[in-house]
Amino acid sequence: MKIESKLENNALLIHVNFNATEKIEDLEEFKLLVQSSGLIPQHVVQTTRNTPTAKYFIGTGKLTEIKELLNHDPVSVILVNHNLSPAQSRNLEAALGCRVIDRTELILDIFAQRARTFEGMLQVELAQLKHLSTRLVRGWTHLERQKGGIGLRGPGEAQLETDRRLIKKRISTINARLDKVAEQRNQNRRARQNQRTPCVALIGYTNAGKSTLFNRLTRSEVYVADQLFATLDPTSRRCYIPELGNIILIDTVGFIRHLPPDLVKAFKATLEETIQADLLLHVIDQHDPKRHEQKEAVRDIIDELGAGDLPMLEVYNKIDLLPGTTAETYSDENGKPVRVQLSSRSGEGIPLLYAALKDLLSNTVE
């Protein structure tokens, strides 16, 4: 039972600025998410509120404005840069006569498009099903097809109960399969540990340049694109570090602020590869003005995974986009490198990264 990505092209974006700073979502980042999903942001509607309304999330005045806009220039889908309750989604769809997708659903859809491995597809489906289980009253008559009309009555209680049982059964099946995959990964991990090959995990905010750095270090060709979540399935390669020897380098999925909890849980087994690493390379886009917030978002997820105490080297990437910025290494009071500035694309600063890796990993090599 695969829940397919069904997003179409033209979209209207709704962004609400709240006075409470912890609830503010970055609009530009949301536009990147939308574009990464394959949608075209045809309209962007912004509004400011102290709190969301219980019924529509937005106020009735803004709702009327959107209705009039859609009457003149309709779109295939409405995207809200916030997480909606099932009732809010249902009410917006009924009022606007158009499919409504919130931030969590959009990210899940992007992940559904990106997953390529058996494990990745299972993990995405698991997250989708958990999210869907709270929203069966809208958009689904049963699990084999999605309801075509918008704002129609939901399925009967008997059918809903059947759907819930089917979802619960499928979730159980997926978890069992993921457990088997996790055991195989554990065996591979133990084999690496027996060989005493240092393991380094690349982590970072989505689109920070992890895959470009991965390709530079391993001389491989992992898919790279200027879009969010270009890399979803983890990739590991053996690579040679001068004066150190071979290491195992792991490229992981990029993080984002307010990553859906169900998605974090579904990918926890994959992300736990980072917990077993000897060193984390935290790749940061030095060119991005939001880099400090992004850095904290990544650290929050790493802490949640229980990897907050692992040795970490910060890699400030994309210095080629900053005129006057040069490759450089920063060390702590003990002389240990804590930060390297470089360009994965041009290769400037890569020798400094090699030296830092040699310094930090020399005690892990027999």
Where in this protein do the model-derived segments appear?
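N-terminal accessory targeting/assembly segments
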Residues: 1-109
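Short hydrophobic segments within beta-strands
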Residues: 14-16, 203, 315
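Canonical P-loop GTPase G-domain recognition
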Residues: 97-148, 310-313, 320-366
